[in-house]
């Protein structure tokens, strides 16, 4: 029974170390990848915001210019 507990503890310890190393590697990979993805996300957010503002402003400007409201 004692040997079984020892081996289970050893397996648990090695598994924990393995998961920790995998997590560190995954985080490092995400950091490298995040820089490019963040730029794309910022561009997407900027374009959608610009389109929303344009959709609200253009009809108002058109109305004021043509005076057909």
UniProtKB/Swiss-Prot annotation:
Regions crossing the membrane: none
Keyword Ligase: no
Disulfide pairings: 63-69
Subcellular compartments: Secreted
Residues cleaved off as propeptide: 23-43
Signal peptide as annotated in the record: 1-22
Listed GO CC annotations: extracellular region
InterPro entries, per database record: Antimicrobial_frog_1, Frog_antimicrobial_propeptide
Tissue specificity annotation: Expressed by the skin glands.
Family: Belongs to the frog skin active peptide (FSAP) family. Brevinin subfamily.
The protein's name in its UniProt record: Brevinin-1CG1
């Amino acid at each position: 029974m004692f040997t079984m507990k020892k081996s289970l503890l050893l397996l648990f310890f090695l598994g924990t170390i393995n998961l920790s190393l995998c997590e560190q590697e995954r985080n490092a990979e995400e950091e490298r990848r995040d820089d490019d993805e963040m730029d794309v996300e910022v561009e997407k957010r900027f374009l959608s915001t610009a389109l929303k503002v344009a959709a609200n402003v253009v009809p108002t400007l058109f109305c004021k210019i043509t005076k057909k409201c």
